[in-house]
Amino acid sequence: MRTLWIMAVLLVGVEGHLMQFETLIMKVAGRSGVWYYGSYGCFCGAGGQGRPQDASDRCCFVHDCCYGKVNGCDPKKDFYTYSEENGAIVCGGDDPCKKEICECDKDAAICFRDNKDTYDNKYWFFPAKNCQEESEPC
């Protein structure tokens, strides 16, 4: 029951473009980003510190770094445009900043897909106390 409540809170907290990120993860990786990566390892979900625990957690670390390089728009709230061409996600639109957000999300979704086999349930709702090591630079 506690897990369902936490997932409901995570879903309510998803704003603007973060729902687009969820959609991209579903399209590319074939699984729910909120469910699988909403609170995984040291970097998936809110915040992020320490060292990535596995390749899936590293996808989130790289995604956080990518968002950190975006200037001129809000990666968590602004909407972007994309299309699907021959099964591939193609980021579009006239706004280079929003296109950057899309590229960050697309790369993370591909990373999740390519690292599904590294996903380990022991990192789901991983305690923050286990993420105290110094973070590596982006």
Curated annotation (Swiss-Prot):
Chief location of this protein within or outside the cell: secreted
Class of enzymatic activity (EC top level): hydrolase
Keyword Secreted recorded: yes
CDD domains: PLA2c
Cofactor descriptive note: Binds 1 Ca(2+) ion.
Recorded family membership: Belongs to the phospholipase A2 family. Group II subfamily. D49 sub-subfamily.
The keyword DNA damage is annotated on this UniProt entry: no
Pfam families per record: Phospholip_A2_1 (PF00068)
Protein source organism: Craspedocephalus gramineus
Cofactor: Ca(2+)
Protein residues bound to Ca(2+): F43, G45, G47, D64
GO molecular function per UniProt: calcium ion binding; calcium-dependent phospholipase A2 activity; phospholipid binding
Disulfide linkage: C42-C131, C44-C60, C59-C111, C65-C138, C66-C104, C73-C97, C91-C102
Keywords recorded for this protein, A-Z: Calcium, Disulfide bond, Hydrolase, Lipid degradation, Lipid metabolism, Metal-binding, Secreted, Signal
Protein known as: Acidic phospholipase A2 1
